């Protein structure tokens, strides 16, 4: 399945900030370090030079990715019409059949962060939740079988 191109405004700004940091701050520092290491002479056994060149390639790869990705991403802002229903950017409190609750935020694949309970819009749980309302029951297929979740709360960061 292809990655969706949706992102929250905060997510887009974070990626843009990362791009600017890499291009304007990190890359010039690493370029200078590589230049200094190259001036020391033999480059074949110069660990600083070799590491610096590797780091420069990593930065350039990430800069290319971010530049291309930021061009195609679609920012999805909060809309008051979304209230009461689950859409992109929503925080949702779910309850499983055992009564355990957990809160998730539906975000773009570029913002996916399990530690923050941010799930990708492309995930099975998020896809099953889209359009649901308070007290709806949702069946989600997982690798271990189907699970049933109940929508307890829906809210948006405005």
UniProtKB/Swiss-Prot annotation:
InterPro entries: GreA/GreB_C_sf, TF_GreA/GreB_CS, Tscrpt_elong_fac_GreA/B, Tscrpt_elong_fac_GreA/B_C, Tscrpt_elong_fac_GreA/B_fam, Tscrpt_elong_fac_GreA/B_N, Tscrpt_elong_fac_GreA/B_N_sf, Tscrpt_elong_fac_GreB. One of its GO terms (molecular function) is RNA polymerase binding. Residues 53-75 form a coiled coil. The keyword S-adenosyl-L-methionine does not apply. One of its GO terms (biological process) is regulation of DNA-templated transcription elongation. Keywords: Coiled coil, DNA-binding, Transcription, Transcription regulation. Pfam families: GreA_GreB, GreA_GreB_N. Belongs to the GreA/GreB family. GreB subfamily. Necessary for efficient RNA polymerase transcription elongation past template-encoded arresting sites. The arresting sites in DNA have the property of trapping a certain fraction of elongating RNA polymerases that pass through, resulting in locked ternary complexes. Cleavage of the nascent transcript by cleavage factors such as GreA or GreB allows the resumption of elongation from the new 3'terminus. GreB releases sequences of up to 9 nucleotides in length. This is Transcription elongation factor GreB.
């Amino acid at each position: 399945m292809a990655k969706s191109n949706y992102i929250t405004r905060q997510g887009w700004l974070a990626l843009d900030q990362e791009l600017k940091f890499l291009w304007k701050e990190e890359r010039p520092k690493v370029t200078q370090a590589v230049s200094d290491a190259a001036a020391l002479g033999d480059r074949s056994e110069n660990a600083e030079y070799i590491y610096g060149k590797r780091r420069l390639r990593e930065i350039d790869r990430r800069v290319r990715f971010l530049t291309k990705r930021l061009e195609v991403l679609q920012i999805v802002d909060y809309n008051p019409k979304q209230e009461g229903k689950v859409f992109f950017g929503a925080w949702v409190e779910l309850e499983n059949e055992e009564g355990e609750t957990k809160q998730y935020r539906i975000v773009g694949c570029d913002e996916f962060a399990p530690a923050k309970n941010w799930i990708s819009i492309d995930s099975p749980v998020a896809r099953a939740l889209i359009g649901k309302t308070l007290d709806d029951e949702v069946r989600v297929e997982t690798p271990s079988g189907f699970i049933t979740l109940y929508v307890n709360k829906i809210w948006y960061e405005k």
